[in-house]
Regions:
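Sigma70-family region 2
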Residues: 20-21, 46-48, 58-76, 95-96
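Residues within the DNA-recognition helix of helix-turn-helix
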Residues: 34, 168-175
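Helix-turn-helix DNA-binding module
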Residues: 128-139, 147-164
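Arg/Lys-rich amphipathic alpha helix in sigma70-family domain 2
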Residues: 66-73, 83-103, 119, 171, ...
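Short helix-capping/turn signature of helix-turn-helix
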Residues: 33-36, 45-46, 142-149
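Internal acidic/polar
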Residues: 8-9, 91, 96-123, 150
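Short, Lys/Arg-enriched C-terminal cap helix and immediately downstream tail that follows
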Residues: 94, 138, 173-186
Length: 186
């Protein structure tokens, strides 16, 4: 007689397969593992709006739950989860663009330029820089360096070729380096 593994000992992919077969406990375990980090992802992508981030996090899991039967063995759970999250952010920012003109969005505001940052708090400086670069580039940076997704996973999530993901990450890093040097010189 085989004894099933404790849920906490199973991989995300194993849990998602169980959830696809109707196990609410397996889905709850996935939620417990990923909700906090996913909400942090949304907070960073939604200008520190914690309430909106919580709504987006819950919406992501609701969509994941509704589509759980479509999950196939061999797929990366995290890539699927962040595909949903990425698309929610992309749609949100697309809706925001109807309010703000593209050229205004791509340029940092005077307030962003004049913000005085303590050079000892690199994290805060980085977050400010990320707010001033175009959203698609900031999103790629966040997926790779903050959420620790691989280039192939990001390519799958964003529906971009791997080479494009790499070149945009390289360009983003150069922009970040240049802007952080400006903060250093203040």
């Amino acid at each position: 007689m085989l004894i099933p593994l404790q849920l906490s000992a199973q991989s995300d992919e194993q849990l998602m397969l169980r959830a696809a077969r109707g196990s609410d406990r397996a889905f709850e375990e996935l939620y417990n593992r990923h909700a906090r980090r996913l909400q942090g992802f949304f907070v960073r992508r939604l200008d520190d709006d914690a309430d909106l981030a919580a709504d987006f996090m819950h919406d992501t899991f609701l969509r994941l739950y509704a589509a759980r039967e479509k999950y196939h063995e061999g797929n990366s759970f995290r890539a699927w989860l962040y595909t949903i999250a990425y698309n929610l952010c992309k749609n949100h920012h697309r809706n925001q663009l109807s309010i703000v003109h593209d050229d205004e969005k791509d340029m940092p505001t005077e307030a962003d330029i004049e913000v005085e940052l303590d050079t000892n708090i690199l994290h805060d400086a980085l977050r400010e820089v990320l707010k001033s670069i175009p959203e698609p580039y900031a999103m790629l940076f966040s997926l790779h360096y903050e959420e620790e997704l691989t280039i192939p996973q990001i390519a799958q999530i964003t529906d971009l070729p791997e080479g494009t993901v790499k070149s945009r990450l390289y360009k983003t890093m150069n922009i970040i380096k240049q802007q952080l040097k400006q903060y250093e010189n203040r």
